[in-house]
């Protein structure tokens, strides 16, 4: 749960 900024 959180920001998916570093999801590739």
UniProtKB/Swiss-Prot annotation:
| GO-annotated biological processes | neuropeptide signaling pathway
Leader peptide range in chain numbering: none
Q: Which UniProt keywords apply?
A: Amidation, Neuropeptide, Secreted
Indicate yes or no for the key word Secreted. Answer: yes
Q: Which residues carry this modification: Phenylalanine amide?
A: 8
- The record's principal subcellular location, in a coarse class, is secreted
Q: Provide the Gene Ontology terms for cellular component.
A: extracellular region
Q: Does the keyword Zinc apply?
A: no
Compartment(s) where it occurs, according to its Swiss-Prot or TrEMBL record: Secreted
Tissue note: In larvae, expressed in the CNS and thoracic perisymapthetic organs (tPSO) but not in the ring gland or abdominal perisymapthetic organs (aPSO) (at protein level). In adults, expressed in brain and thoracic-abdominal ganglion but not in corpora cardiaca and corpora allata (at protein level).
Belongs to which family? Belongs to the FARP (FMRFamide related peptide) family.
The record describes the protein's role as: FMRFamides and FMRFamide-like peptides are neuropeptides.
Record-given protein name = FMRFamide-like neuropeptide GGNDFMRF-amide
């Amino acid at each position: 749960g959180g920001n998916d900024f570093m999801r590739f």
